[in-house]
A protein has these predicted regions:
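Amphipathic alpha-helical segments
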Residues: 22-37, 96
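Vicinal oxygen chelate
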Residues: 1-7, 12-21, 68-151
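Short secondary-structure junctions
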Residues: 35-41, 101-105
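Conserved short beta-strand elements that form part of the metal-binding/catalytic scaffold
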Residues: 37-74, 117, 123-130
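Conserved N-terminal glycine/acidic-rich loop preference
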Residues: 3-10, 17, 49-51, 57-59
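Alpha-helical elements of the RecA-like P-loop NTPase motor core of helicases
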Residues: 27-28, 91, 125
Length: 151
C-alpha cells in the first residue's frame, strides 16, 4: 500500500524570480530564444511562462545597467532547468540557442542537456529526461549527442 501524501509540504516549484539589468533585453531573450510566453509586463518587471497551467514560471525584475551580475564563486542559485518534451524538442532548442548566439556553458557527459547563459550571466539548462528504459544509454559517458551536433 502506498504511503499517504505528506501534508503541509509544497507540491511543486511555482516560479523563479530573477534580477536582471534590462527587462526588455531579458524579455527578448526569454521569449525569442528560450520560447516562453510573455504573460504580463510592467515598467520594470515581466512575467513569463511555458505552461498554460500556471500564471507564470519566470519573473524578471530590472535593476539597471550598472547592476553587478551573478557571482559563480558566491552563494546563490547555480542554475534553473527547463525540461523539454522530447529529444527532438531539445535538438531544436539547442539549434535556436546557437542561431541566436547564446553563450553555451557546456553539456553533461551523462545526460541529454545543454547549459547556457542568459544575457545577464544567469546559468540555465534545457534537458530531456529520457524514458526509463533509455536512461542508462543516455547516462553513459558520451551519451549526450548535443556537443557533437554543436561542432
Amino acid at each position: 500500500m502506498a504511503a499517504a501524501p505528506a501534508q503541509g509540504v509544497p507540491t511543486q516549484l511555482s516560479h523563479v524570480a530573477l534580477r536582471v539589468r534590462d527587462v526588455g533585453r531579458a524579455v527578448d531573450f526569454y521569449t525569442n530564444v528560450v520560447g516562453l510566453q510573455l504573460r504580463n509586463r510592467r515598467e520594470n518587471a515581466a512575467f513569463l511562462g511555458a505552461s498554460e497551467e500556471q500564471s507564470h514560471e519566470l519573473a524578471l525584475f530590472g535593476l539597471g545597467d550598472t547592476a553587478e551580475g551573478p557571482d559563480p564563486k558566491g552563494v546563490g542559485m547555480y542554475h534553473m532547468a527547463w525540461q523539454m518534451a522530447s529529444f527532438a524538442d531539445l535538438e531544436q532548442f539547442h539549434e535556436r540557442l546557437l542561431t541566436h548566439g547564446a553563450k553555451i556553458a557546456g553539456y553533461s557527459d551523462t545526460s541529454c542537456n545543454v547549459m547556457f547563459f542568459d544575457p545577464d550571466g544567469n546559468e540555465l539548462e534545457a534537458f530531456w529526461e529520457a524514458p526509463k528504459e533509455l536512461r542508462e544509454e543516455a547516462r553513459r559517458p558520451g551519451g549526450n549527442p548535443l556537443p557533437r551536433l554543436a561542432r
